[in-house]
């Protein structure tokens, strides 16, 4: 979450506005840093992709200003194509490097497939923008065509036939998800956010299908499949109910009972058998044994339940204040919204230090609960639908302009993705050394500490504003300082972290991501942890 009151709309300035150029400059610093660290043909592809995305981004911005985009996108931000386009490719590159260093060829190839899939979906988004822009932007088409040609040529000679098919399958899923979800969820995403979120879901769905078809008789590691099945199951459930409630009123008791019954049927009849096929054991029994395997896990679960209770009490207290307020449009102040960031930090740090597998599973379960409650709120499912609408409306901001409220889900994703995306098979011989030891803390540092401190200090004491934004220099500087202090505390309390004198890279990574937070208009809860993860893992 950001600290500005109301970010400028795309139409409030020229396409080549200073804030957009500054955001692009920060992104190119990240891309070139990873290119210098990796320096192979795949990193050259990432540079080419960033160059063409930089030019195509302005076509998307113009389409949004003119209202000529195919779907209804969120209007309180620019398109965000450039920062979103390079995330999956860069993530794949750094995963490849880490697994190559660990001597794991399977996951080294997996990283290349991640990078290739990210480039494919990014090129599709660029082609879509160029295809609907009138008049046809000849120069931009030439640049995009040259970059795309280089990427396709290199990938053609680097990927096996099976890997090419895998990338094309993920691209096909991405195209269909774009048509379905962007139609069902108008104004929920910018083009860049749609690329990032739907690209990730498409890749996960394709991986789940692949692993379901190639599962062997031996038991699989449940942690490798639990997240895939839960995320894909919740997305498919949402598509199913969205289609169903087109033909019936979702707010009646009959529809609500049907919703709960079908949720049980889909969960017990589809999701659990699917997970059972993958892990070759009873999923519920495995989950119960996993959660209560050690005494430490029991204490952690009790502690997390206490924090969840505190979060619920904060929501109820703020709504009680609104009820007694004279203004019916009372909104929670910035500091109040940041309470949840503090609660999440207090949740994740003990989990990262004491039991990361438990945190991995608990975050997955929490994500499923958040998505399910959002379905209940969105479809007005009785008995909680209207209550959730009233309670959560207090915490809305300009980014919740669509039918879904996604900021709390993005916060959970931003904190959890560094846990989920750490290449565990490539770190089994020992923890990551140097700056890479901080990878699991990327969400805590970027969002839990950095964004929270920047928002509070920027909104209360900030006076010097960054050009073209409502973000402040004081907020950014205090954000960097707070993250440095947090790194020092992590060194004290987590004995498994050994930075190996990589302090300059850590400081540069934190500063770069803090500058990105100052200029981006995208969902920073999701974007910032991914960029910090990429830089720390490089």
Curated annotation (Swiss-Prot):
Chief place where the protein resides: endoplasmic reticulum
Cellular component GO terms, alphabetically? endoplasmic reticulum membrane
TM spans, by residue? 19-39, 75-95, 112-132, 135-155, 164-184, 189-209, 225-245, 255-275, 298-318, 338-354, 360-380, 402-422, 437-457, 473-493, 496-516
Is Aminoacyl-tRNA synthetase a UniProt keyword of this protein? Answer: no
Gene Ontology BP terms: dolichol metabolic process; dolichol phosphate mannose biosynthetic process; dolichyl monophosphate biosynthetic process; protein mannosylation; protein N-linked glycosylation
Pathway in which the depicted protein is active: Protein modification; protein glycosylation
Q: Which residues lie on this side of the membrane: Lumenal?
A: 1-18, 96-111, 156-163, 210-224, 276-297, 355-359, 423-436, 494-495
* Cellular location(s): Endoplasmic reticulum membrane
- UniProt-listed InterPro entries: Polypren_kinase
Query: How does the UniProt record describe the way this protein sits in the membrane?
Result: Multi-pass membrane protein
What EC number(s) does the entry state? 2.7.1.108
Q: Segment CTP-binding: which positions?
A: 459-474
The top EC class is transferase
Its annotated function is as follows: Catalyzes CTP-mediated phosphorylation of dolichol, the terminal step in de novo dolichyl monophosphate (Dol-P) biosynthesis. Dol-P is a lipid carrier essential for the synthesis of N-linked and O-linked oligosaccharides and for GPI anchors.
What PANTHER family would the database entry show? Answer: DOLICHOL KINASE, TRANSMEMBRANE PROTEIN 15-RELATED
Q: Mind telling me what this protein is named?
A: Dolichol kinase
